[in-house]
């Protein structure tokens, strides 16, 4: 019962906190907008040639392209989470997964499932996460989660 209740609560909190997202509004994440510009020549080259470029001029006057975007053949976590996050999309999914990840970690440490809900909520709703979601540091959130 606790797992279903915890996941449902995390889902409801995420949906409630980012309610404007579900009305069609978009959070203008600055770093995501910058990434799209830096990534455009990489995507264009990948589409035209079918290969990943080794260099890009789209950031800092030129740098290795793998630092911005690279297509690895097997990205199990990204593919698994990607399917789930399509239900809510970013930013609500980032908040949801941060709470779920903390709750699962607490369970592994032997914390009572009901008790673990409170610190998981606190972790997901911490100021730091909400600030970096707004800034568009999505990969940083995935790394922390």
Predicted regions and their residues:
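N-terminal membrane topogenic signal
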Residues: 1-6
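Membrane-helix interface segments
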Residues: 111-117
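Membrane-interface coil-to-helix junctions
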Residues: 11-102, 109, 121-145
């Amino acid at each position: 019962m606790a797992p279903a209740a915890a996941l449902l609560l995390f889902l409801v909190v995420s949906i409630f906190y980012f309610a404007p997202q579900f009305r069609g509004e978009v959070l203008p994440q600055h770093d995501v907008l910058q990434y799209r510009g830096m990534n455009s020549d990489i995507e264009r080259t990948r589409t035209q040639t079918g290969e990943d470029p080794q260099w890009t001029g789209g950031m800092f006057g030129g740098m290795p392209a793998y630092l911005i975007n690279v297509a690895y053949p097997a990205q199990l976590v990204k593919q698994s989470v990607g399917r789930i996050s399509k239900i809510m999309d970013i930013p609500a999914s980032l908040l949801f997964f941060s709470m779920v990840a903390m709750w699962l970690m607490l369970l592994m440490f032997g914390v009572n499932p009901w008790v673990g809900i409170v610190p998981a909520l606190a972790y997901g709703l911490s100021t730091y996460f909400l600030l970096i979601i707004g800034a568009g540091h999505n990969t940083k959130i995935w790394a922390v989660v």
